[in-house]
Amino acid sequence: MLRFIPSSAKARALRRSAVTAYRLNRLTCLSSLQQNRTFATQPTDDFLTGGAADYVDEMYDAWKKDPNSVHASWQAYFKNVQERGVSPSKAFQAPPLLDYADSYTALDSSLINGNNYADIDVGIYMKVQLLVRAYQSRGHHLAKLDPLGINVNHNRPSELTLEHYGFTESDLNRTIHLGPGILPNFREAGRKTMTLREIVETCEKIYCGSFAVEFTHISSRKRSNWILSHLETPTPFRYSHDQKIMIFDRLSWADSFERFLFTKFPNDKRFGLEGCEAMVPGMKALIDRSVDEGISNIVIGMAHRGRLNLLHNIVRKPAQAIFSEFRGTQDPDDEGSGDVKYHLGMNYQRPTPSGKRVSLSLVANPSHLEAEDPVVLGKVRAIQHYTSDEASHEQSMGILIHGDAAFAAQGVVYETFGLHALPGYSTGGTVHIVINNQIGFTTDPRFARSTPYCTDIAKSMEAPIFHVNGDDVEAVTFICQLAADWRKAFKTDVVVDIVCYRRHGHNETDQPSFTQPRMYKAIAKHPPTFKIYTQQLLQEKTVSKAEVDAQEKRVWDILESSFESSKNYKSDHREWLSNPWVGFASPKDLMTKILPSYPTGVNIDTLKQIGKALYTLPEGFDAHRNLKRILNNRNKSISSGEGIDMPTAEALAFGTLLEEGHHVRVSGQDVERGTFSQRHAVLHDQSSENVYIPLNHLSPNQASFVIRNSSLSEYGVLGFEYGYSLSSPNALVVWEAQFGDFANNAQCIIDQFIAAGETKWLQRTGIVLSLPHGYDGQGPEHSSARMERYLQLCNEDPREFPSEEKLQRQHQDCNIQAIYVTKPSQYFHALRRNIHRQFRKPLVIFFSKSLLRHPAARSTIDEFDEKHGFKLILEEEEHGKSILPPEKIEKLIICSGQVWVALSKAREENKIDNIAITRVEQLHPFGWKQMAANISQYPNLKEIIWCQEEPLNAGAWTYMEPRIYTILKHLGRDLPVRYAGRPPSASVAAGNKQQHLAEQEQFLNDALL
């Protein structure tokens, strides 16, 4: 069947000549009845090259559906080419009787319909189409976007000139039929023709006014046409009197709030919104439209710029609370250390004009720009999970508010964009709003990015980009509503770029004229947005001067009243919380009460039942033969109760939690199989490639198990999982690094959110970081999770032995937990312990790659039952067997993790019987009481050695040394504490296998001999 090949972004990148030749060849293939003929590109074929080829496609598709839907000239053109074999390069040329009469026939007179020849001049029609297309693709270059008028592009693209198409002034009055490619929506509205002058004026109004759009990078014709249908209309938007009054009211609040703060606190940093106040009515319009379209939950992320304004006017934080924070009158209390006012989060059930309510959540954020982006999306995804909205994305959405410099420069922006369409991560589209004040602190855009627009990164995801002048409040409102409509229609990202300015410096104490004198001279003369809009409404007679004055006075009086009440305002830190956990221990309870611990063991019959479900394949499932062996061995270990390994223990932990009703989510690179082929949580049929997830087939009433291979991102994905963990305490959320070495790509999330989020923002999380760690001779990038860095983040004081009360509160008071276990049962209990509490804490697991299958790392099923739980340390088990009893031990080696296996093996091979080895399974919070009791059982010790695989400047030595000395002081014992491990090293590990082995032999000798 004859057809044109639809154009795409990829096709445009091909050489134009090749594309043209291909299209011409396709055009002249008359099904199977006529021999294919390829035409070389000729000078007269210019209308078939470049962007024009897109229109040939559009015209042809329209003609095939309904010949009368296109202009008579197109009808003649396609009929001549397809039915009469006329060359595409000749079919449109004058005169109507074409060359080579023996081959070509005249244009079908029945298609002319009484029009004169000018009416069917396809060349003219094509040129007008190209002109319209040029406005669609390049009109934004001429749009009046800069409120200050200092960054105006005076270089008009040649494609937007009449001369480019051979038109002259005399052609402006030429009548052009509207239709496909030339303002078709106007034709549908009843306008059949326009003069060329009217077409140009209409395109200028649509594409070069106070808003503009970039959409030609979108490969989907359906989506592109959606944009055209909303913009290429006689009136893209027109607000009623009442709607304008609402916009006016919302803008007045945004304007007055900033002016009030500037009046009362002129020397305080507030990172005001002056210059972009239009964002507030725009955001409110976006929220209202989204709610009308079915949204009931919105999670918002933004940096400092305008945050206080948004907190008050959109998320409805009481003004007196904000003023109280400026005053600094709040007393320190026991609910965390707090953060600056423009970092705090907030939750609010907001009513909308339609009568519906929406749950708004503004997440807390650090000053690390854009770091909150993936956090927001993770939280949205979690809400969608708990509301059964993961497939439709109709109820919950995210809004991210960016700064122009950060949006263009921060890599996490791209990582976050990259999640938008991934299974397990998609949230159905995010609305991105850029507060584009055309400066980054003191840096001009030309030094801050390498692209024309700060939003160009969004093109890689085919998101439409709407630019809008921040001084045109109604245009901002319209574009924000249009963004909501796009998200509703296509469930993909959309970008709103509000081009504005920053009236003051980066903060209000800064002097911006040092570096941007021209800009700030213009700003000094420029009226505020509220004044501009007020003047517009006065001219329209929408409002009177008296009404304007009354509105300003009303808002100011309310703010003044709030200011007075702020003097005695007592903060309720619950207003900070961006994730209230109803029915769960509050941050206050956590700080003041000793909460009970719950058992983590499970009935053996239950374990065996789960094990059978885990390792029994469905009938007819063709698993890989090696995998069958692995699954059979794991099943036998559970049924026999002997030799349970680490992966099996993990599966049992997940399975028992699922059966108890706790959602489990595991995410990271290659987690479905496991980096080390250890997990096999997702099984692949070798014949059909269908997948089977045993953990989702335990019982009808189990909770949901989700495991997803992530994109090759650490920062973005860990931020996403952290956000996911905030939504509910009733879930075990695990992020696993491919190797622990790569987790430092996400250091910002670890430092600013996971380790400090609860202390700063009362933002609680039980996220689990699973980090492969261990020196196995694989070199400096596959050996270390940088244990020392996590331990440095821990908030415990090593200088004093804790009181009994502090020991009971250890896990409540800690900021993170860090473990390095050596037994599968320990792994099992640690995972379950993280859920079986009335509070949540981050858990960092350093897991040994070599212990995943090591015979020494095995547990019996009895160690998983109700009588057992997690042990902070594991004492020596060989007393009276291969080594002497405790009273005869002279040397105690304390270690953590897989080095225990090497030490035990070397001790056995060298027949050493006077050295005991104690394993620290939990590094933080430290097992003070347990370690003191362990040391006390050795009365004749001569020395204590801390042994580790890591170099001296890495690992746990600097963490452990002061704690061991504090314990010895507490016990009243004076013993030397010695280090045995690798020497200091700039590189994490040796890349040479022989050097690795030599270093290991050396520190084992140091420890044992």
From Swiss-Prot:
<feature type="binding site">
    <location>
        <position position="437"/>
    </location>
    <ligand>
        <name>thiamine diphosphate</name>
    </ligand>
</feature>
<dbReference type="InterPro" id="IPR042179">
    <property type="entry name" value="KGD_C_sf"/>
</dbReference>
<feature type="binding site">
    <location>
        <position position="305"/>
    </location>
    <ligand>
        <name>thiamine diphosphate</name>
    </ligand>
</feature>
<dbReference type="InterPro" id="IPR005475">
    <property type="entry name" value="Transketolase-like_Pyr-bd"/>
</dbReference>
<dbReference type="InterPro" id="IPR011603">
    <property type="entry name" value="2oxoglutarate_DH_E1"/>
</dbReference>
<feature type="binding site">
    <location>
        <position position="439"/>
    </location>
    <ligand>
        <name>thiamine diphosphate</name>
    </ligand>
</feature>
<keyword id="KW-0496">Mitochondrion</keyword>
<keyword id="KW-0560">Oxidoreductase</keyword>
<dbReference type="GO" id="GO:0004591">
    <property type="term" value="F:oxoglutarate dehydrogenase (succinyl-transferring) activity"/>
</dbReference>
<feature type="binding site">
    <location>
        <position position="437"/>
    </location>
    <ligand>
        <name>Mg(2+)</name>
    </ligand>
</feature>
<comment type="function">
    <text>The 2-oxoglutarate dehydrogenase complex catalyzes the overall conversion of 2-oxoglutarate to succinyl-CoA and CO(2). It contains multiple copies of three enzymatic components: 2-oxoglutarate dehydrogenase (E1), dihydrolipoamide succinyltransferase (E2) and lipoamide dehydrogenase (E3).</text>
</comment>
<dbReference type="GO" id="GO:0006099">
    <property type="term" value="P:tricarboxylic acid cycle"/>
</dbReference>
<keyword id="KW-0816">Tricarboxylic acid cycle</keyword>
<feature type="binding site">
    <location>
        <position position="669"/>
    </location>
    <ligand>
        <name>thiamine diphosphate</name>
    </ligand>
</feature>
<feature type="binding site">
    <location>
        <position position="404"/>
    </location>
    <ligand>
        <name>Mg(2+)</name>
    </ligand>
</feature>
<keyword id="KW-0809">Transit peptide</keyword>
<dbReference type="GO" id="GO:0005739">
    <property type="term" value="C:mitochondrion"/>
</dbReference>
<dbReference type="Pfam" id="PF16078">
    <property type="entry name" value="2-oxogl_dehyd_N"/>
</dbReference>
<dbReference type="Pfam" id="PF00676">
    <property type="entry name" value="E1_dh"/>
</dbReference>
<dbReference type="InterPro" id="IPR031717">
    <property type="entry name" value="ODO-1/KGD_C"/>
</dbReference>
<dbReference type="GO" id="GO:0030976">
    <property type="term" value="F:thiamine pyrophosphate binding"/>
</dbReference>
<dbReference type="InterPro" id="IPR001017">
    <property type="entry name" value="DH_E1"/>
</dbReference>
<dbReference type="Pfam" id="PF16870">
    <property type="entry name" value="OxoGdeHyase_C"/>
</dbReference>
<keyword id="KW-0460">Magnesium</keyword>
<keyword id="KW-0479">Metal-binding</keyword>
<keyword id="KW-0786">Thiamine pyrophosphate</keyword>
<feature type="binding site">
    <location>
        <position position="439"/>
    </location>
    <ligand>
        <name>Mg(2+)</name>
    </ligand>
</feature>
<dbReference type="InterPro" id="IPR029061">
    <property type="entry name" value="THDP-binding"/>
</dbReference>
<feature type="binding site">
    <location>
        <position position="404"/>
    </location>
    <ligand>
        <name>thiamine diphosphate</name>
    </ligand>
</feature>
<dbReference type="GO" id="GO:0042645">
    <property type="term" value="C:mitochondrial nucleoid"/>
</dbReference>
<comment type="similarity">
    <text>Belongs to the alpha-ketoglutarate dehydrogenase family.</text>
</comment>
<dbReference type="Pfam" id="PF02779">
    <property type="entry name" value="Transket_pyr"/>
</dbReference>
<dbReference type="GO" id="GO:0046872">
    <property type="term" value="F:metal ion binding"/>
</dbReference>
<protein>
    <recommendedName>
        <fullName>2-oxoglutarate dehydrogenase, mitochondrial</fullName>
        <ecNumber>1.2.4.2</ecNumber>
    </recommendedName>
</protein>
<dbReference type="InterPro" id="IPR032106">
    <property type="entry name" value="2-oxogl_dehyd_N"/>
</dbReference>
<feature type="transit peptide" description="Mitochondrion">
    <location>
        <begin position="1"/>
        <end position="39"/>
    </location>
</feature>
<dbReference type="GO" id="GO:0045252">
    <property type="term" value="C:oxoglutarate dehydrogenase complex"/>
</dbReference>
